[in-house]
Amino acid sequence: MNKRKIGLAMSLVIAAGTILGACGNSEKSSGSGEGKNKFSVAMVTDVGGVDDKSFNQSAWEGIQAFGKENGLKKGKNGYDYLQSKSDADYTTNLNKLARENFDLIYGVGYLMEDSISEIADQRKNTNFAIIDAVVDKDNVASITFKEQEGSFLVGVAAALSSKSGKIGFVGGMESELIKKFEVGFRAGVQAVNPKAVVEVKYAGGFDKADVGKATAESMYKSGVDVIYHSAGATGTGVFTEAKNLKKEDPKRDVWVIGVDKDQYAEGQVEGTDDNVTLTSMVKKVDTVVEDVTKKASDGKFPGGETLTYGLDQDGVGISPSKQNLSDDVIKAVDKWKKKIIDGLEIPATEKELKTFKAE
């Protein structure tokens, strides 16, 4: 009996020790000495910066939403970001966040593909996610979008809203990604007005508001009355030029189509009731970032996977701000949206555009 009692007592002690040990191992230390078991997340911006009113800002809003929902504080052991002033900062910033032991680190933008690949190799115990590119590594989740689908819809809106039949597209840097915006947009215009002309210009960067303004000025002077920009912070220059023209002549039809976020507020002409934002192609980076971060915090990080979001996944679309679209245009956009969700393939390259037939 005594031996049995001693054995039972020892078993209880061992069991208790095991439980305590497991608790101790699951606790993640934070610099503030509080917040055990907290998941930390951070991001590195592209050169457009965290306030670009576009995809960098949208990604940060997704991280902030996750942080606030989970009681995290901005900074180390919570949620944070580092801004890149040039592409030379990408690797340095990613490495800095990795050294600070963030659980998940985002690289925002396809230009960070090489840097994410390099740091992911060096930091195999850290999870990374890249937006708008594919990095085939077990500790990297690749997040991509069908930008051509949302761009097609705003192309339909542009073609049906334009009075001149001359439409513009301003891109940041010419690349495979931005061509998806351009080609999808042109396909949408072509689908409803084959006679419309789309003038295409690239600014050579996503942080060149002055170039965006000058490009818009040239386009509007040539008779273009709607410009779709896919240019990050460069697009603020397009808005500036449109607002200046509208302020000079309130009766003039001059429109901008925003990108990534609902940019209706960006089109407000100061001191008036006028707004030059026709609509926006929203790319729901914020929602996707929050969702992927939640999966990672739940132990379901999609490492090694490529996640693609289109209209059917509610990853892209047309903005809810439709004050400047007529009822007929909205109905047409909705009709084409249904066609795409039902299987209409929207072109993403010049080659695909040449053989595209709207149904």
Swiss-Prot record:
Keyword Lyase tagged: no
Tree of life domain: Bacteria
Residues annotated as signal peptide: 1-22
Primary location class: membrane
An example Gene Ontology CC term for this record: plasma membrane
Membrane topology: Lipid-anchor
Keyword Disulfide bond included in the entry's annotation: no
Lipid addition sites, S-diacylglycerol cysteine: C23
Knockout-associated phenotype: A null mutation does not lead to any detectable defect in guanosine uptake. However, in the nupG-nupN double mutant, guanosine uptake is reduced to an almost undetectable level.
Location of the protein in the cell: Cell membrane; Membrane raft
Regions crossing the membrane: none
Entry keyword set: Cell membrane, Lipoprotein, Membrane, Palmitate, Signal
Matching PANTHER family: ABC TRANSPORTER GUANOSINE-BINDING PROTEIN NUPN, TRANSCRIPTIONAL ACTIVATOR PROTEIN MED
Function: Part of an ABC transporter complex involved in the uptake of guanosine. Is probably the substrate-binding protein of the system. May be a nucleoside transporter of broad specificity but with various affinities for different substrates.
Record note on quaternary structure: The complex is composed of two ATP-binding proteins (NupO), two transmembrane proteins (NupP and NupQ) and a solute-binding protein (NupN).
Protein name: ABC transporter guanosine-binding protein NupN
